[in-house]
């Protein structure tokens, strides 16, 4: 049975009205829904590894890994499976429950699929949830990754449909949404969110969330990224810092529109004060990345995260049960 508060027919007008509520009312509504679906004191933890860095043919205007931009990021080849598994072991020892593997591609080559599937199987055998972000996938690639045991696939839509053309030209919003739907239909849980602070308007942030909340099914995980300064990318010239309360309002709106989705504070936490992160947790954020590095940006030190959670009386959530998937 689908809970009555899970809707996929939200309108921008409804979302705009909720977003404009007085701050105490907005926070109360978000926290009430959060408590209905989650332990409000539990925070999920994930670790992220770039398994193939740089040289991406896409021209995403925010990305340091695009071959179109002079950012100083050196292109690397796909990592060896054992290197990835060694990193996964370190992540588990550091407290991560989920291990995310990202490759800077438009889409993976079929010749790489055996190694990618080996990585998924190896990470799963360590007892970690598995996640990958590899760009666009064919139906056959989705099926292979699912058979290997992939739990989650990340494919962000980045921004609103109206603002998307300002961000990238080598792939469309429709391309991204098609990939997300293909992953969902293939039986892999969807991780899909966006980036705030790339020069977009408040209306774009609201429309981004409405786009996610009106998918056939809400994403299992919704990463909320804050733009982090990167020299050499087009977005740098028009990026604008996000007001702290504006960020909290967006997190609260995401919780209200998608009450059962995990909301992950992702890139940009190094720019957030402890107080701002606490407000985001109160608004419904319930996941973070652990480890001092994301794909190409920094992340708070492990001791800082442990200290913050302790001071707030929060704890790391137990890993969710992973369904068994037969391998080929």
From Swiss-Prot:
Cofactor note as given: Binds 1 [4Fe-4S] cluster. The cluster is coordinated with 3 cysteines and an exchangeable S-adenosyl-L-methionine.
The name this protein goes by in its record: Biotin synthase
Family according to the record: Belongs to the radical SAM superfamily. Biotin synthase family.
EC number of the protein: 2.8.1.6
GO biological process terms, semicolon-separated: biotin biosynthetic process
Cofactor: [4Fe-4S] cluster; [2Fe-2S] cluster
Domain (Radical SAM core) ranges: 41-260
The keyword Manganese belongs to this UniProt entry's keyword annotation: no
Keywords in alphabetical order: 2Fe-2S, 4Fe-4S, Biotin biosynthesis, Iron, Iron-sulfur, Metal-binding, S-adenosyl-L-methionine, Transferase
Cited PANTHER family: BIOTIN SYNTHASE, BIOTIN SYNTHASE, MITOCHONDRIAL
Pathway(s) of this molecule: Cofactor biosynthesis; biotin biosynthesis; biotin from 7,8-diaminononanoate: step 2/2
Organism superkingdom: Bacteria
TM region positions: none
Chain residues that bind [4Fe-4S] cluster: 56, 60, 63
Catalytic activity: (4R,5S)-dethiobiotin + (sulfur carrier)-SH + 2 reduced [2Fe-2S]-[ferredoxin] + 2 S-adenosyl-L-methionine = (sulfur carrier)-H + biotin + 2 5'-deoxyadenosine + 2 L-methionine + 2 oxidized [2Fe-2S]-[ferredoxin]
């Amino acid at each position: 049975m689908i809970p009555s508060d899970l809707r996929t027919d939200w309108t921008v007008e409804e979302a705009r009205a909720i977003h404009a509520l007085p701050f105490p009312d907005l926070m109360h509504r978000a926290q009430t829904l959060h408590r209905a679906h989650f332990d409000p004191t539990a925070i999920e933890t994930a670790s992220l590894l770039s398994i193939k860095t740089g040289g991406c043919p896409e021209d995403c205007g925010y990305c340091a890994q695009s071959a179109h931009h002079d950012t100083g990021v050196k292109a690397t080849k796909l990592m060896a499976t054992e290197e990835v598994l060694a990193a996964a072991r370190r992540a588990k020892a550091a407290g991560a429950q989920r291990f995310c593997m990202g490759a800077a591609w438009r889409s993976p080559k079929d010749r790489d699929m055996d190694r990618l599937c080996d990585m998924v199987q190896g990470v799963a055998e360590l007892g970690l949830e598995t996640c990958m972000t590899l760009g666009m996938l064919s139906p056959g690639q989705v099926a292979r990754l699912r058979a290997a045991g992939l739990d989650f696939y990340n494919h962000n839509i980045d921004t609103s449909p109206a603002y998307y053309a300002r961000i990238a030209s080598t792939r469309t919003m429709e391309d991204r949404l098609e990939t997300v739907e293909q992953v969902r239909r293939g039986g892999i849980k969807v991780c899909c969110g966006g980036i705030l602070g790339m020069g977009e308007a408040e209306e774009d942030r609201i429309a981004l969330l409405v786009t996610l909340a009106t998918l056939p099914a809400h994403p299992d995980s919704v990463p909320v990224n804050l733009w982090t300064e990167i020299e050499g990318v087009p977005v740098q010239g028009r990026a604008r810092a996000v007001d702290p309360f504006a960020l909290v309002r967006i997190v609260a709106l995401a919780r209200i529109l998608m009450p059962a989705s995990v909301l992950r504070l992702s890139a940009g936490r190094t720019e957030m004060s402890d107080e701002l992160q606490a407000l985001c947790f109160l608004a419904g954020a319930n996941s973070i990345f652990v480890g001092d590095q994301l794909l190409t940006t920094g992340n708070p030190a492990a001791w800082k995260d442990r200290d913050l959670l302790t001071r707030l009386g929060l704890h790391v959530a137990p890993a969710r049960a992973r369904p068994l998937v037969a391998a080929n």
